[in-house]
């Protein structure tokens, strides 16, 4: 199913790369999203070394793209807080908060990565990108139905 995500990324005007210079700089980095170059990258060696799943990492990074297309949170409060408490282990929450990044954005992405199938993320990305290209204002706090 990783090919479905790659195809959805291409339809959205993105390139998926299996490496990036940042991967060598940070062996714990699994992937990232470069807005300026419209590139989502996977750190394939790190993913293998950590025993992670490339499809899950790509799904996570594409949810970050969807967050950017929607220019805001995808889940409304208090739903986000309730789901995060029920789904994400407290140690992981503390690690994200300590990282100094936008904690709510990252936690929302981790939550949705766990909750949404590859098919849903692919559909959501292609629909969001198409609406964005048409200049349609995309409502936030809207999760598509699972096909």
What are the residue ranges of the model-derived segments?
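Soluble non-cytosolic domains of exported or imported proteins
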Residues: 48-57, 99-107
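Non-transmembrane alpha-helical segments in soluble domains
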Residues: 6, 55, 59, 63, ...
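Active-site scaffold of zinc-dependent metalloenzymes
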Residues: 21-55, 68-69
């Amino acid at each position: 199913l990783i090919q479905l995500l790659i195809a959805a990324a291409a339809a959205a005007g993105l390139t998926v790369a299996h490496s990036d210079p940042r991967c060598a700089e940070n062996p714990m980095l699994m992937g990232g999203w470069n807005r300026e170059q419209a590139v989502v990258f996977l750190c394939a060696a790190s993913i293998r070394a950590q025993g992670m799943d490339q499809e899950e990492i790509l799904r996570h990074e594409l949810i970050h793209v969807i967050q950017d297309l929607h220019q805001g949170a995808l889940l409304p409060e208090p739903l986000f807080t309730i789901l995060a408490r029920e789904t994400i282990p407290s140690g992981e929450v503390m690690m994200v908060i300590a990282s100094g990044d936008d904690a709510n954005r990252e936690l929302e992405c981790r939550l949705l990565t766990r909750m949404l199938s590859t098919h849903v993320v692919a559909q959501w990305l292609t629909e969001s990108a198409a609406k964005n290209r048409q200049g349609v204002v995309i409502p936030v706090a809207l999760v598509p139905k699972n096909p």
